[in-house]
Curated annotation (Swiss-Prot):
Its EC number is 3.1.1.1. Disulfide bonds: none annotated. Keywords: Hydrolase, Serine esterase. This is Esterase FrsA. It comes from the Bacteria. Coiled coil: none annotated.
Length: 416
């Protein structure tokens, strides 16, 4: 996109768009449970609608000072808010609005990328832009037009970055049963030759498929593994599909199509699930055990939160809004939403608790409000070859890296 057009698109103030936190209309949870910290989701305080996920944003490559700079601009805004108690609810696409400020930051990096003459630097600048555009769209609520524009910019920047960085990115199109096609990204390491053993990424509900570049760059590529990603239902390239009780539907379509992808060794495929992505990955472990060598999960959501209404009352509103949005239930009553969520439990579906032939690893943090140890243990104890991976909370960044190293090594063992 030409820089002039980008500026016109991004920075022309507009006041007609609904503010993100108003798109899902459900009963708000008590403010008493709003102060929460989760390693994978970040921190929820009384002053922000969104969970501020510094760990994951820094891990993805965003400078900590840049994060604080953007957050301070949002916090300092005097513009009208849909909720005056929440800093990130500025109405309209203008200074102080969450999407505006993060997209503006992304455009700065895009400008630097177009002016850089060094390939490695250009690629990194494009990747920085992609990360910031993705945060602009966070938490990717369905029907948020400005967020959807930011998602498009994130994907464009991500594809531009790959032209300059030392790996190959192929945009693949898969036909989906019932109509339509789905776009996925196949990341291939430069130090090996196709066909590659491949990790099928099953992502978290509030992230784009482009958010997992660091996972490929630092963990899978050095191990000689490719990474195949798609967006979760109702987000990005998967926006035409809502999340259903058959949560693994889209990923299953990809898995079955892999024999036709020449760069993938379809006999050496594993899956990795983040948060709700673990629901998808573990479901695949049962339904497609002949096609998967192993499944690893981190902070899985497969039963307890989905089936326990008391737990649901204890998580931030943003998280419940994301679930409602993915399920296509933005205007449902809490009772209807909680009843429907119960049907997504893999234990309720009759899967978990039954012996699964696929090797499964499940990592968890002590005192994780979304994934107790029992959640990970349920997965491990259901596998013929299960491995439980406890992760200490502090120091957070080092332990997160160590967990990913262990998971990558475990996955590599399964495909070698």
């Amino acid at each position: 996109m030409a820089q002039a057009n980008l500026s016109e698109t991004l920075f022309k103030p507009s006041f007609k768009h609904p503010e993100t936190s108003t798109l899902v209309r459900r009963t708000r949870n008590s403010q008493d449970v709003q102060g929460l910290h989760s390693t994978l989701e970040g921190e929820k305080t009384r002053s922000w609608y969104r969970m501020i996920n510094r760990l994951m944003w820094i891990w993805r490559g965003v400078d900590p000072w840049e994060i604080e700079d953007v957050l301070s601009r949002i916090a300092a805004s005097k513009a009208d808010r849909s909720n005056e108690q929440l800093l990130d609810t500025v109405i309209g696409y203008r200074g102080g609005n969450w999407i505006y400020e993060w997209a503006k930051q992304g455009a700065d990096w895009q400008q630097r990328a177009t002016e850089s003459g060094d390939d490695a630097q250009t690629g990194q600048f494009w990747l920085n832009a992609a990360n910031l555009y993705s945060i602009a769209a966070y938490p990717h609520i369905k029907g948020d037009e400005l967020a959807e524009q930011a998602q498009t910019l994130a994907n464009r920047a991500y594809e531009e970055a790959a032209k300059y960085l030392p790996y190959e990115l192929k945009e693949l199109t898969f036909p989906i049963a019932g109509g339509g096609t789905l776009t996925g990204f196949l990341h291939m390491p430069s130090q090996a030759k196709a066909p590659f053993p491949t990790v099928l990424m099953c992502g978290s509900l509030e992230m784009l498929q482009s958010d997992y570049h660091r996972l490929f760059q630092d963990y899978f590529a050095p191990a000689g593994m490719a990474m195949l990603t798609i967006d979760v239902p109702s987000v990005g390239f998967s926006s035409r599909w809502k999340l259903t009780q058959d949560s693994s539907f889209l990923h299953q379509q990809l898995l079955r199509a892999l024999p036709d992808v020449p760069w993938v060794d379809h006999s050496r495929v594993v899956a990795f699930g983040f948060r709700f992505g673990a629901n998808i990955a573990v479901r695949l472990a049962y339904l497609e055990s002949q096609r998967l060598r192993g499944v690893a999960c981190l902070g899985p959501l497969v039963h307890h939160l989905l089936s326990d209404s008391t737990r649901q009352q204890q998580v931030p509103d943003m998280f419940m809004d994301v679930l409602a949005s993915r399920l296509g239930m933005p205007f449902s009553t809490d009772t209807s939403l909680k009843t429907e969520l119960g049907r997504y439990s893999l234990k309720t579906q009759g899967l978990l608790g039954r012996r699964c032939p696929t090797p499964m690893l499940a990592g968890y943090w002590d005192n994780d409000p979304l994934c107790p140890k029992e959640e990970a243990s349920l997965i491990v104890n259901s596998s013929a070859q299960g491995k439980l991976l406890p992760v200490n909370f502090s120091p957070v960044y080092q332990n997160f890296d160590r967990a990913l190293q262990q998971i990558s090594g475990w996955l590599q063992d399964k495909v070698c």
